[in-house]
Amino acid sequence: SSSRDFGSMLKFITRTKPHVFSEVIYHVQVSTLLDMGYLSKVNYYPMNPTGWNELNLKINTTGADYTDKSVQKEYERIDFYSYIVHIVQRLMNPKAGGKRKGILVFTRFLKEAERLTMSIPGCVIVSGDTPKKERERILEMFKVGEIPVVANVGVLTTGFDYPELDTVVMARPTMSLAMYYQIVGRCIRPHKDKEAAWFVDLCGNINRFGEVSDLHLKDTGNGKWAVFS
């Protein structure tokens, strides 16, 4: 992975205005938390679809991520929609590892999520347009196993507490280390009944950023901390 400064992830600590904190007095690396059992073991599965070409993705004007248009064009070119369905169906009936507790799919656009709900019985969409109470109802049903798959569009990267969750599918490319870290974080919470979570990446993100254990905090000088992968 490239050593790129993603210090904006820690902006709230030492770079806020007004200046509340001036220094970080203690830090712990993710790899240490994994070794100590405070985070769940994660098995990483990079599964790019045949023909996927990251060179076709264009960077937006801010340089922060890929343009919607280029991502949609690549999806259409390789029929990414059918591939997502194929992968999720395989995960629902794995050849090894036992039945998954729940499958949370992260998509970039509504179209992929709709394709999943059309093809997989019981799959439900959660998006920014889903009313709060309806979202809470869906997630509670997901947690107790009444909903096997949740396809979420641009939400649930933070604030979703479900330690038993053992399968996350990242069905969207990103240049944002913060987003990648947050998405992996949905399945990294430890639970006594979870031996290891599965993180299935369909868009080259593992190759881009590495495993979460590869992330490390570093003081880049003048109290400005950054995250590197």
Where are these regions (language model features)?
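Conserved strand-helix element at the start of the C-terminal RecA-like helicase core
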Residues: 70-123
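Post-DEXD/H (motif II) to motif III coupling segment of the RecA-like Helicase ATP-binding lobe
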Residues: 1-44
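Cys/His-rich short segments
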Residues: 67, 219-229
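Conserved nucleotide-binding/hydrolysis micro-motifs of P-loop NTPases
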Residues: 1-5, 32-35, 48-53, 111, ...
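Conserved segment of the helicase C-terminal RecA-like domain
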Residues: 173, 178-182, 186-217
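Short glycine-/polar-rich loops that comprise or flank the Walker A/P-loop
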Residues: 21-23, 39-43, 121-122, 163-167, ...
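Conserved helicase ATPase core of P-loop NTP-dependent helicases/translocases
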Residues: 104-106, 112-158
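SF2 helicase motor core recognition
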Residues: 37, 149-169, 184-192
